């Protein structure tokens, strides 16, 4: 059998003091459940294509 991949949404969250903390930004157009990809100089949404540049 193939090796199991560690994927899924759980890698976008971290648990601190019994509470979950989001590690990525959420797309302002798509809403909850759609995380933005982190790049060196920007954040981008893979669904709608929204790009936010870092200051």
UniProtKB/Swiss-Prot annotation:
<dbReference type="InterPro" id="IPR022845">
    <property type="entry name" value="Ribosomal_eS31_arc"/>
</dbReference>
<dbReference type="InterPro" id="IPR011332">
    <property type="entry name" value="Ribosomal_zn-bd"/>
</dbReference>
<keyword id="KW-0479">Metal-binding</keyword>
<keyword id="KW-0862">Zinc</keyword>
<feature type="binding site">
    <location>
        <position position="45"/>
    </location>
    <ligand>
        <name>Zn(2+)</name>
    </ligand>
</feature>
<feature type="binding site">
    <location>
        <position position="48"/>
    </location>
    <ligand>
        <name>Zn(2+)</name>
    </ligand>
</feature>
<dbReference type="Pfam" id="PF01599">
    <property type="entry name" value="Ribosomal_S27"/>
</dbReference>
<keyword id="KW-0689">Ribosomal protein</keyword>
<dbReference type="GO" id="GO:1990904">
    <property type="term" value="C:ribonucleoprotein complex"/>
</dbReference>
<dbReference type="GO" id="GO:0005840">
    <property type="term" value="C:ribosome"/>
</dbReference>
<feature type="binding site">
    <location>
        <position position="27"/>
    </location>
    <ligand>
        <name>Zn(2+)</name>
    </ligand>
</feature>
<dbReference type="GO" id="GO:0003735">
    <property type="term" value="F:structural constituent of ribosome"/>
</dbReference>
<dbReference type="GO" id="GO:0006412">
    <property type="term" value="P:translation"/>
</dbReference>
<comment type="subunit">
    <text>Part of the 30S ribosomal subunit.</text>
</comment>
<dbReference type="GO" id="GO:0008270">
    <property type="term" value="F:zinc ion binding"/>
</dbReference>
<protein>
    <recommendedName>
        <fullName>Small ribosomal subunit protein eS31</fullName>
    </recommendedName>
</protein>
<keyword id="KW-0687">Ribonucleoprotein</keyword>
<feature type="zinc finger region" description="C4-type">
    <location>
        <begin position="27"/>
        <end position="48"/>
    </location>
</feature>
<keyword id="KW-0863">Zinc-finger</keyword>
<feature type="binding site">
    <location>
        <position position="30"/>
    </location>
    <ligand>
        <name>Zn(2+)</name>
    </ligand>
</feature>
<comment type="similarity">
    <text>Belongs to the eukaryotic ribosomal protein eS31 family.</text>
</comment>
<dbReference type="InterPro" id="IPR002906">
    <property type="entry name" value="Ribosomal_eS31"/>
</dbReference>
């Amino acid at each position: 059998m193939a090796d199991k991949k560690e994927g899924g949404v759980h890698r976008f969250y971290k648990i601190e003091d019994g509470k979950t903390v989001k590690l990525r930004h959420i797309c302002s157009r798509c809403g909850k459940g759609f995380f933005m990809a982190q790049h060196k100089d920007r954040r981008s949404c893979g669904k709608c294509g929204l790009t936010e540049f870092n200051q």
